[in-house]
A protein has these predicted regions:
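N-terminal low-complexity segments that are often proline-rich with Ser/Thr-Pro
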Residues: 160-163
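Conserved helicase/translocase P-loop NTPase motor core
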Residues: 87, 112-117
Length: 163
């Protein structure tokens, strides 16, 4: 198991048959065992439609999806950019909440919220970790283009929101 705060960005790379999918599934499974559904939401992107389909049974518990989305596991490449854009909007909203709470990261924010030092009437809410897992990222970039790179490039502010 690993700490999301210490590894906010991970790229798994390797040749065909080297265990990338096995590694991703091990990471996902370890997080499922470590966190309660209220603490963690996954956004799974699976252009091949077969790698993450086993997680459809946890759709109502651990998977996040857009309000107008049909499936929690994104298999349509055209919907990936829209989903990543929505995640960036959520990230900006979270930064505003972190700033208003005078904290530096999500862990401190949630501790403050749990200890009732943040007022829900002022928009404060418990923030689950959001973990985006994209299978075949290289293929996605080739298909969806530069838009995916814009939304997935790590920035210093991403690091603060994930801690």
């Amino acid at each position: 198991m690993f700490d999301l705060c210490k590894m906010p960005h991970v790229l798994v790379a390797g040749a065909t048959g080297q265990g990338k999918s096995v590694g991703l599934n091990a990471i996902i499974t370890s997080l499922l065992y470590k966190k309660h559904p209220a603490e963690l939401k996954f956004v799974l992107v699976d252009p091949k439609k077969v790698e993450f389909s086993i997680y459809s049974v946890i759709e109502h518990h651990f998977l996040a999806k857009l309000p107008d989305g049909e499936d929690a596991i994104i298999t349509d490449v055209t919907k990936v950019v829209q989903t990543l854009n929505s995640i960036c909007i959520e990230m900006d909203t979270r930064y505003d909440l972190l700033k208003a709470a005078h904290v530096r990261n999500i862990k401190e924010y949630n501790e403050k919220f749990i200890n009732r030092r943040l007022n829900p009437e002022k928009g404060h809410k418990f923030m689950p970790y959001i973990v985006v897992v994209i299978d075949e990222f290289g293929d996605l970039i080739m298909t969806a283009g530069k838009d995916c790179l814009l939304y997935t490039s790590p920035s210093p502010r991403d690091y603060a929101a994930s801690r």
